[in-house]
């Protein structure tokens, strides 16, 4: 991770990444792995990847506050590079869709550890990436971007970079993200009403809804929005029961729900 500790090297690599995104990469074609994919979700079969990744020896970012700041800075630079290309080519929405697919893929621990493992060769990683690209239908510049992360040994930061891209995308498009948590899946009409409500409260140009299922709420739903979900609207039965318990001075009683 020497490059993370060398600002000059970091700037050089990031500049190269921005320039390289505008061109298609030429790569060798190593013998592909026989991996199982689901065409609907574009995810790996975790067992096959665990077999491929015998050792989870990953390149971890430098610890402590300094390490966190350096990781954040690096992620921001790469995410901004991808956003710049998407903005110039008029593919922001499509690129954000690519990023959402990649977030789901790399949230699978075996997938992430496979790519972050420095013991596994770049050719092998590219071979597996080719399958991801084909199955997920990624745009050429998004596919090229992930190849750049592999070549520049920044693939271990892919989660941070993808999350940072979402933040950059939201700022560019004036989008407010609202996380709606409910006991059961809400109908699209209900989600549309919630989106309108959040838009009215925040004044955002666009509102994007993310849904989470949490049976512990008993009934109703909660809405989190704002900077890192700092704002909360709690319409759950669980919250109402807690308020009733507080009014009856039953704070020390645990409600079985």
Curated annotation (Swiss-Prot):
It holds the Pfam family OSCP. InterPro entries: ATP_synth_OSCP/delta_N_sf, ATPase_OSCP/d_CS, ATPase_OSCP/dsu. One of its GO terms (cellular component) is proton-transporting ATP synthase complex. GO terms for molecular function: proton-transporting ATP synthase activity, rotational mechanism. GO terms for biological process: photosynthetic electron transport in photosystem I; photosynthetic electron transport in photosystem II; proton motive force-driven ATP synthesis. Keywords: ATP synthesis, CF(1), Chloroplast, Hydrogen ion transport, Ion transport, Membrane, Plastid, Thylakoid, Transit peptide, Transport. Residues 1-70 form a transit peptide. It is found in: Plastid, Chloroplast thylakoid membrane. PANTHER family: ATP SYNTHASE DELTA CHAIN. F-type ATPases have 2 components, CF(1) - the catalytic core - and CF(0) - the membrane proton channel. CF(1) has five subunits: alpha(3), beta(3), gamma(1), delta(1), epsilon(1). CF(0) has three main subunits: a, b and c. This protein seems to be part of the stalk that links CF(0) to CF(1). It either transmits conformational changes from CF(0) into CF(1) or is implicated in proton conduction. Belongs to the ATPase delta chain family. This is ATP synthase delta chain, chloroplastic.
């Amino acid at each position: 991770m020497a490059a993370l500790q060398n600002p000059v090297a970091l700037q050089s690599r990031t500049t190269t990444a921005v320039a390289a995104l505008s061109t298609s990469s030429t790569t060798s074609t190593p013998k592909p792995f026989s991996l199982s994919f689901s065409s609907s979700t574009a995810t790996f079969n975790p067992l096959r990847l665990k077999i491929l990744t015998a050792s989870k020896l990953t390149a971890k970012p430098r610890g402590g506050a300094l390490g966190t700041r350096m990781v954040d800075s690096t992620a921001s630079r790469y995410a901004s590079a991808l956003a710049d290309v998407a903005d110039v080519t008029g593919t922001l929405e499509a690129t954000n869709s690519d990023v959402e697919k990649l977030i789901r893929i790399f949230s699978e621990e075996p997938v992430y550890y496979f790519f972050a493992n420095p013991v596994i060769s770049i050719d092998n990683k590219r071979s597996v990436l080719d399958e991801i690209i084909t199955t997920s239908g990624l745009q050429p510049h998004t596919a090229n971007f992930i190849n750049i992360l592999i070549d520049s040994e920044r693939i271990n930061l892919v989660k941070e970079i993808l999350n940072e891209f979402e933040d950059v995308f939201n700022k560019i498009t004036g989008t407010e993200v609202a996380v709606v948590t409910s006991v059961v899946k809400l109908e699209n009409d209900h989600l549309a009403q919630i989106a309108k409500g959040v838009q009215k409260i925040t004044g955002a140009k666009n509102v994007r809804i993310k849904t989470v299922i949490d049976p512990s709420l008993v009934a109703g739903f909660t809405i989190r929005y704002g900077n890192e979900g700092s704002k909360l609207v709690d319409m759950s039965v669980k919250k109402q029961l807690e308020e009733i318990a507080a009014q009856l001075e039953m704070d020390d009683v645990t409600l079985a729900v």
